[in-house]
């Protein structure tokens, strides 16, 4: 415990430096803004902002990107409550009860419990990350190459299973992502793979080009098809203070939502969205006020908002301890770290203590900033909703082109980004979720490296994957998970749950 407090003190020393404070505030503000604006989201925003992080210290850059992620969870609740339109996917559930509360004259109370519940959950989840991170790191150090390969394979399967839509489409996206990760020159043999004679592909496909294209430009093209009509709730927001009854009813929901989010956020493919849905389903089943659900039950706002913010924090656990992304945002974080020359994984605690503990402590600082700035600035966020998308999207596209060109001063990178933007749009029209592709792209080369190491150490004996207990257990879990979801009954149940 003494060591934990010592590490946290070191982390706060890093997080409270002027540069890191400013970038944490910048990330929180950008995150809130893109959370408020429907149709953009943290994945697209982080992918668009990756180029500007190259000139920054690694700790400062990751602190800003993390602030965008959990800031979007705060901002998404504003549009969900005031417009009945989720600014972020994880806020879809908040529309069910939050907008009803607003129609009943309790918009202020809904916004307050969303912000306060998110802050409490973020604080608890930050402590969970701080306490569990070093412990899991010690466990991860005992992993061999075969264990890592099996763990990454399990992560890919879970990300496919938890993705929305057809399980076969999700698996296809994972396979495509792994294949894209293999493009370029094989570092072991020097042979070029899947380059088709294009010299620019000898170094592989650009991570920024794929992320920015699929999640940035692809989303912009898709949003241009949607009607722009947005009507903000007429009338005043009302008092921000909760009544004594609302406060009493909210506390258990916030506690349960925090627990659900802290656990589900760690799962590959889980994250904030799954946690929010899980929390809402739980509240609807166990609440004493079930009859109010659908007409403005405060539990339906408190629980999911706590859950999605807790999950946003704990999704960093597998990234920081194992180097494995739990969702698309964490895959972008892996890319940002690798671009900075840092290999995420169990050795980060010792090799990059400023980054590891500074990031953890900045999460709490960022959550405090969000609590302080969000409620007083509700009027400004509502004004932001009035910005026409016909002005917003062209500016984003120009920013994309400049950012991706500045990486290598290469026009080919711009063309590559546009190609993946069109591909991302096609994926959306075919209802093929792109997150498993990005996770596969990040994990594919890592899996290949660990596979080769395992085969070298075992002198080509594939039995090493089932002889090591950890590897065998992970492979068994992966096989059972995939086999279960291929059963028609369970697949239908999953689709029904996601639809609800």
Give residue spans per PLM region:
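Helix-loop-helix hairpins and the membrane-proximal interhelical loops
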Residues: 1-61, 134, 138-141, 192-297, ...
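Membrane-interface alpha-helices at helix entry/exit sites of multi-pass transporters
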Residues: 59-63, 100-117, 288-301, 328-331, ...
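Membrane-embedded alpha-helical modules
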Residues: 112-228, 339-493
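Transmembrane alpha-helix interface/packing and boundary motifs in multi-pass membrane proteins
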Residues: 28-42, 72-84, 159-164, 258-268, ...
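A structural-propensity feature for long, helix-poor, extended segments
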Residues: 69-81, 87, 297-322, 326, ...
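Short helix-coil transition sites and intra-membrane helix breaks within transmembrane domains
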Residues: 34-43, 81-92, 124-128, 264-274, ...
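Flexible loop linkers connecting adjacent transmembrane helices
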Residues: 48, 81-109, 135, 139, ...
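Re-entrant/interfacial helical elements at transmembrane boundaries that shape
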Residues: 42-51, 65, 80-100, 131, ...
């Amino acid at each position: 415990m003494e060591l934990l407090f010592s590490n946290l003190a070191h982390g706060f020393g890093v997080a409270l430096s002027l540069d890191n404070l400013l970038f944490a505030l910048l990330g929180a503000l950008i995150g809130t803004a893109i959370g408020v604006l429907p149709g953009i989201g943290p994945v697209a925003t982080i992918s668009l902002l990756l180029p500007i992080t190259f000139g920054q210290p690694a700790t400062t850059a990751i602190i800003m990107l993390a602030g965008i992620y959990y800031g979007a969870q705060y901002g998404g609740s504003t549009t969900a409550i005031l417009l009945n339109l989720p600014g972020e996917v994880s806020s879809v559930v908040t529309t069910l009860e939050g907008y009803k509360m607003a129609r009943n004259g309790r918009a202020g109370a809904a916004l307050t419990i969303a912000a306060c519940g998110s802050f409490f959950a973020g604080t608890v989840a930050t402590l969970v990350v701080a306490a569990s991170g070093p412990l899991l790191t010690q466990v991860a150090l005992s992993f061999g190459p075969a264990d890592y390969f099996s763990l990454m394979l399990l992560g890919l399967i879970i990300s496919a299973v938890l993705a929305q839509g057809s399980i076969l489409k999700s698996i296809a996206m994972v396979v495509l992502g792994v294949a894209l990760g293999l493009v370029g020159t094989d570092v072991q043999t020097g042979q070029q793979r899947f380059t088709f004679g294009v010299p620019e592909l000898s170094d592989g496909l650009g991570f920024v080009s794929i992320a920015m294209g699929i999640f940035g430009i692809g989303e912009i093209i898709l949003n241009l098809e949607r009607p722009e009509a947005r009507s903000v709730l007429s009338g005043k927001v009302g008092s921000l203070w909760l009544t004594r009854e609302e406060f009493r009813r909210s506390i258990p929901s916030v506690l349960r939502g925090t627990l659900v989010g802290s656990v589900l956020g760690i799962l590959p493919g889980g994250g904030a969205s799954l946690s929010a849905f899980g929390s809402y389903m739980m509240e609807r089943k166990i609440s004493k006020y079930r009859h109010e659900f659908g007409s403005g039950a405060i539990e339906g706002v408190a629980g999911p908002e706590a859950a999605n913010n807790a999950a946003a924090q704990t999704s960093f656990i597998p990234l920081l301890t194992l180097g494995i992304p739990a969702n698309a945002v964490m895959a972008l974080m892996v890319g940002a770290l690798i671009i900075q020359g840092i290999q995420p994984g169990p050795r980060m605690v010792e090799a990059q203590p400023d980054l590891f503990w500074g990031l953890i402590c900045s999460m709490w600082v960022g959550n405090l900033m969000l609590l302080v700035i969000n409620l007083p600035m509700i009027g400004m966020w509502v004004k932001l909703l009035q910005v026409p998308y016909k002005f917003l999207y062209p500016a984003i596209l120009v920013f994309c082109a400049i950012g991706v060109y500045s990486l290598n001063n290469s026009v080919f990178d711009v063309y590559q980004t546009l190609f993946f933007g069109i591909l991302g749009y096609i994926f959306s029209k075919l209802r093929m979720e792109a997150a498993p592709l990005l996770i596969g792209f990040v994990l594919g080369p890592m899996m290949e490296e660990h596979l080769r190491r395992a085969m070298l150490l075992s002198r080509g004996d594939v039995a090493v994957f089932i002889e090591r207990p950890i590897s065998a257990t992970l492979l068994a879990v992966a096989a059972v998970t995939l086999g279960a979801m291929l059963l028609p009954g369970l697949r239908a149940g999953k689709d029904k749950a996601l639809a609800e």
